[in-house]
UniProtKB/Swiss-Prot annotation:
Residues 801-821 have a biased composition (Basic and acidic residues). High affinity uptake of sulfate into the cell. PROSITE patterns: SLC26A, STAS. This is Probable sulfate permease C3H7.02. Residues 594-747 form the STAS domain. InterPro entries: S04_transporter_CS, SLC26A/SulP_dom, SLC26A/SulP_fam, STAS_dom, STAS_dom_sf. The chain crosses the membrane at residues 133-153, 161-181, 186-206, 221-241, 243-263, 292-312, 329-349, 384-404, 424-444, 461-481, 484-504, 518-538, 543-563. It is a multi-pass membrane protein. Residues 643-663, 793-821 are annotated as: Disordered. One of its GO terms (biological process) is sulfate transmembrane transport.
Length: 877
């Protein structure tokens, strides 16, 4: 068609067009039934063709006055005496090629560059680095370095590795992490729980093959765990961490802390060789108590050190609160208490042992090699990797949970965003590079991260200065490390690990918030103490997964009713009352029981799902819908079966006593079911099949087609799935000759300025309008919600009474030159009339077509209905 013909075609009257071009009708766009209460003066219709060739129905109205409900003398505003047009809107359903094009192939090069750049967050903030940041990072780095050196050696002792391996892990963790980090506070290095897991892994592998060296096992474990963690981050799978709740993490962390403390008491008292520290925690405690008579001089070093550590801690905390001027001094004193106690203990040990170096009276650390003597390409054994395969899940879980939970907590406290996927990459890269230094697995440390944050660190570059302190210790202080008492190191470990135990108040809080999660916490601690740390971790993870699946399989869906509410802004006579209907659970959970929640319109069920509609909960939702429908509605035809033998065995006949009088069933027929999908983010094949089965069962019960309406669908793929299963429109297109369309105005409203409008602090009504106080009886007796139909009724209407003498309550744009032409557009696609914006729109649509159908006679549907399957795209029975 040429351009001139297109112009003529556009301006031509549809009646003058050729028969093959003039539309006979537009499906669904017809006047309402004659017995329907009119909201506006009868409109006139004309079909035309838009510029794009789309058939559009234009609706013309005469001007109508709108009055406040119950007060016909006060006009709120008047519609301009101009045309109001409502066009079409067809929303395309998503497709797999379209998704791939949009999310994968669209701007692929730009996406790839952005992804590669995101792997190195240091590129974003390093160009803006300044001297002020440098000063704070230097102070924080040195402070953390003074803590990480004694802790690194102590935790290496927990891991049953030589002390230098703890220093290697400490150096690599703080030096490499800053390149990939999204958290400025986290300090990566040896930690108590991961060191304990490493010791268990070493013991298990050496039990299979004693030829493996402990350091080799620790390095290989770091390689494998780091590779898995880094891979999860590169694939953006960090969300899997969210499947384990906080109580589960707290459970096995508490169990691990108890195990570590129990294992260090024997070293504190000087008889470590008499206690098997790799046994279950309760056995370690029993053996420790049994060997108390074998206590040695080491106990003097250990117990005194432990007492001083706690004394300094609580004294400094008290002085910080009392003398705020010197809180910086007290803070540094508190932070350096572990380093100072080791220095003092080492000096005393040197005085005691310097003349008896070959046979010291106390247990001392011994020789620590200087520098990075073990640095190099590691030798990885395939057999060792195979032996470690069964130990990897526990190691990876501990690495993930400890680090991410610490990073997120400091991100919340200090107001910056932590990216879990990038943190996994950072942790994985740190452990992979640490293999070349013969480091064992490292992750985020809560105690050192807290010190880092309180020291005023500004960027992750503070880890470089911490690494410098570790290097200085490795090259200059290893000679002094020889005389460090093991009892003092045990005191430092017990003091550090004690904070990992969840206090009883937190346990009580778990119980008050979520009793089931509190039980998971208790079970994790119990299994960790009486079995093993590995079993405690598995117990916490499995119970958390079971609880999650249970909640998905048994969603707390609710059937909705209508509650009329009003907002009272002031107590004076100038207050404004806003009355509206809302849909709330019929059981009134969480509401005042004195309120009256009305049932939805007769024959209509409104159900709100609280979870995604997937295979675990499909059967449960099906049972809830069918059970409720058969309770509140009657069967469409009680005599559907001609003979008793025709009735299925699972469909018992109604029972009545002999000679009992016939009682008329006043329950309504089932007309429609409205499903509120506002909380549904996904629906799978099983869920759709459950809906198809539910519809089939209820249609046999009702004796006619039951409409399934869906509201608040927030995912295009859900619409695609429902449409493929035959939902979204009536299956018998000839039966429903009218429907309503939710339309929205393209012009702003100017009647009432609300607090949401700029420059206003309260609602201001036009000066010509008197505002009445709230009338409770009027609110209760008010009628059905606004009916906004395709006849062009304005979407700004508030409510419509079922009494013909009452007027429409609401407001319209005032007379203004800018409102010379009002255009209204469908809010959602008009292709699928059973998809709605909200529950109110769905109820309006059903009432518009059913509520006045007094001669409605349902047709009889036998039990020989053809099986419906979701393979039928039209959903026909």
């Amino acid at each position: 068609m040429s351009f001139i013909k297109k112009i003529k075609h556009y301006f031509a009257d549809p009646a003058d067009l050729p028969q093959d071009e003039a539309p006979d009708s537009v499906p669904g766009l017809v006047p309402p039934p004659s017995n329907f209460v009119p909201v506006y003066p009868e409109p006139t219709y004309s079909d035309t063709v838009s510029k794009k060739g789309t058939i559009v129905r234009v609706v013309r109205h005469t001007a109508s006055k709108l009055t406040k409900h119950g007060d016909s003398s006060q006009s709120l505003s008047t519609l301009p005496n101009n045309d109001i047009s409502v066009g079409e809107y067809v929303e395309p359903l998503p497709s797999v090629p379209g998704w791939l094009k949009q999310n994968i192939f669209s701007h692929f090069g730009t996406r790839l560059l952005h992804y590669l750049r995101s792997l190195f967050p240091i590129m974003n903030w390093l160009p803006r680095y300044n001297w002020n940041w440098l000063v704070y990072d230097f102070i924080a780095g040195i402070t953390v370095g003074c803590v990480v050196v004694p802790q690194g050696m102590s935790y290496a002792k927990v891991a049953t590795l030589p002390a230098q391996y703890g220093l290697y892990s400490s150096f690599v963790g703080v030096a490499i992490y800053c390149i990939f980090a999204t958290s400025k506070d986290v300090s990566i290095g040896p930690v108590a729980v991961m060191s304990l897991v490493t010791s268990k892994v070493i013991a298990n592998v050496q039990a299979k093959d004693p030829n493996y060296d402990a350091a080799q096992i620790g390095t290989t474990l770091a390689l494998l765990a780091g590779a898995i963690t880094c891979g999860l981050g590169l694939l953006r799978l960090g969300f899997i961490i969210e499947f384990i709740p906080v109580p589960a993490v707290a459970g096995f962390t508490t169990g691990s802390a108890l195990n570590i403390m129990a294992g260090q008491v024997s070293s504190l008292m000087g008889y470590k060789s008499r206690v098997h520290t790799n046994a279950a925690t309760y056995r370690v405690i029993i053996q420790t108590l049994q060997n108390l008579p074998h206590t040695k001089v080491d106990a003097a070093f250990g117990l005194v050190s432990l007492f001083i550590l706690y004394l300094v801690r609580y004294t400094c905390q008290h002085l910080i609160k009392r003398y705020t001027k010197f809180q910086r001094v007290f803070f540094l004193t508190n932070v350096l208490r572990s380093a100072v106690i080791i220095i003092v203990g080492t000096a005393i040990s040197y005085g005691v042992c310097k003349h008896r170096r070959e046979n010291p009276p106390i247990s001392i650390l011994g020789t620590v090699p200087s520098g990075f003597r073990d640095m190099g390409v590691p030798v990885i054994s395939r057999k060792l990797c195979a032996d470690l395969a069964s130990e990897l899940p526990v190691s990876v879980i501990v690495l993930l949970l400890e680090h991410i939970s610490i990073a997120k907590s400091f991100g919340r406290v200090n107001d910056y965003k932590v990216i879990p996927d990038q943190e996994l990459i950072a942790m994985g890269a740190t452990n992979l590079i640490g293999v070349f230094f013969h480091a064992y697995p490292a992750t985020g440390s809560f105690s050192r991260s807290a010190i880092n944050a309180k020291s005023g660190v500004r960027t992750p570059l503070g880890g470089i200065f911490t690494a410098g302190v570790v290097v200085l210790a490795l090259y200059c202080l290893t000679g002094a490390f020889y005389y460090i008492p093991n009892a003092v190191l045990s005191a430092v470990i017990i003091h550090s690990v004690f904070d990992l135990i969840i206090p009883w108040r937190q346990t009580l809080l778990f119980w008050r918030m979520q009793p089931l999660e509190a039980l998971i916490f208790i079970c994790a601690v119990f299994v960790s103490v009486f079995s093993s740390i590995e079993n405690g971790i598995y117990t916490a993870v499995c119970l958390s997964a079971a609880l999650l699946l249970f909640r998905i399989a048994k969603p707390s869906g609710s059937f909705l009713g209508i509650l009329k509410i009003a907002n009272k802004f002031d107590d004076d006579e100038n207050s404004i009352d806003v009355v509206r209907d809302i849909y709330v659970p019929l059981n009134q959970k969480g509401m005042n029981p004195n309120l009256t929640v009305r049932d939805p319109p007769a024959g209509v069920l409104i159900f709100r799902l609280q979870e995604s509609f997937t295979y675990p909960n499909a059967g449960h939702v099906n049972s809830m819908l069918t059970s409720k429908a058969k309770t509140v509605t009657r069967r469409g035809n009680a005599n559907i079966y001609k003979k008793a033998s025709d009735r299925p065995w699972n469909d018992p006949a109604p029972r009545k006593k002999k000679n009992a009088p016939e009682v008329e069933d006043t329950r309504p027929l089932l007309r429609a079911i409205i499903l509120d999908f506002s909380a549904v983010n996904h629906i799978d094949t099983t869920g759709v099949q459950a809906l198809v089965d539910t519809r089939k069962e209820l249609e046999i019960y009702a004796g006619d087609e039951v409409e399934f309406h869906f509201t608040d669908i927030n995912n295009d793929w859900i619409k695609r799935t429902l449409v493929a299963a035959g939902f979204g429109k009536a299956r018998d297109a000839t039966k429903y000759t009218s429907r309503s369309i939710e339309v929205g105005s393209a012009a702003p409203l100017r009647d009432i300025e609300t607090p949401m409008a700029p420059g206003n602090s309260r609602i201001v009504m036009p000066s010509s309008v008197r505002v009445r106080p709230f009338d409770e009886e009027e609110a209760i007796e008010s009628s059905i919600p606004a009916i906004v139909s395709e006849d062009g009724a304005d979407s700004d209407t508030i409510s419509v009474s079922d009494d013909k003498d009452k007027k429409v309550e609401g407001h319209r744009p005032s007379q203004d030159p800018t409102f010379s032409h009002h255009e209204y557009y469908p809010v959602i696609s008009t292709t699928y009339p059973f998809f709605h914006v909200d529950v109110t729109s769905a109820v309006v649509d059903i009432q518009y077509r059913h509520v006045l159908d007094v001669n409605y006679k349902p047709k009889i549907v036998t039990n020989e209905v053809e099986n419906e399957n979701i393979e039928h795209s039209d959903g026909a029975a």
